[in-house]
Regions:
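Active-site beta-loop-alpha junctions enriched in small/polar residues
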Residues: 6-10, 35, 62, 79, ...
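Catalytic cores of alpha/beta
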Residues: 18, 57-72, 76, 96-107, ...
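Conserved strand-to-helix beginnings and helix N-cap segments that scaffold or border functional pockets
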Residues: 16-17, 42-43, 180-184
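Active-site mouth loops of central-metabolism enzymes
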Residues: 1-16, 92-94, 147-149
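Glycine-rich phosphate-binding active-site loops on the catalytic face of alpha/beta enzymes
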Residues: 5, 76-85, 112-125, 155-193
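Acidic-and-aromatic substrate-binding clefts and catalytic sites of carbohydrate-active enzymes
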Residues: 13, 37-40, 177-178
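Charged helix-capping and loop-helix junction motifs
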Residues: 44-46, 126-135
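N-terminal active-site wall of soluble small-molecule enzyme domains
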Residues: 21-23, 27-87
Length: 193
């Protein structure tokens, strides 16, 4: 099962070092999500990361940076719903309903489905799906290896996410809300499952 980590919405001091540390400890593919950040701000952040990791990063904003920095790809969402003209690389997308998954899954490398559980990082962002609904979606072939679970994912949820047939889990609050000394040990524990 894939583990994807999304950055926090705002830049923070030491973030480049934290993301680099995640890479060094086995993070395969982070998603750079900075709503409202300028291309310059995002470019400055990317320049703080070792160049060897650029081909593993997916950006949610400022899609032109994908070619400038040789990033893995782009992630479509409500703010940026269209693939740029001429773009041929990796594409993922946020989906907030099973209908959206059906509509977009075949056009993407994978999609995020959310919120699976009550969000850790977004107050009032509650689970949208019952376990029964998710099981039926799996049986119908809607949830499969191209669908990543997002929203309130914690260590305790990973076995259920796997049993429901998701291809992976997308983490945000559970990773970034860890104390500095627990940050990497927690990520390594998540990776073991």
């Amino acid at each position: 099962m894939k583990l994807i980590v999304i950055t926090t919405p705002q830049f923070f001091e030491g973030e480049a070092e934290a993301v680099t540390s995640l890479f060094q400890n086995g993070l395969v593919m982070p998603h750079l999500r900075k709503p409202g950040a300028s291309a310059e701000e995002m470019g400055n952040f990317l320049q703080q990361l070792p160049m060897e990791y650029m081909p593993r990063i997916v950006t949610h904003e400022q899609f032109q940076l994908a070619s400038v920095f040789g990033l893995k790809g782009i992630h479509l969402n409500g703010r940026n719903p269209q693939i740029p003209s001429g773009y041929k690389g990796h594409v993922s997308r946020s989906c907030h309903s099973l209908e959206e998954v059906l509509k977009h899954k075949s056009d993407c490398n994978y999609v995020f489905l959310s919120p699976i559980y009550d969000s850790i990082s977004k107050e009032g962002y509650s689970s949208a799906y019952s376990c029964d609904t998710l099981q039926k979606a799996q049986q119908a072939g809607i949830i499969d290896s191209k669908v990543m679970a997002l929203g309130g994912i914690t260590l305790e949820h990973l076995p259920e996410i796997a049993a429901l047939g998701f291809g992976g889990a997308v983490l945000l609050g559970d990773v970034w809300q860890q104390a500095k000394e627990a940050f990497i040990p927690h990520f390594l524990h998540l990776k073991q499952l």
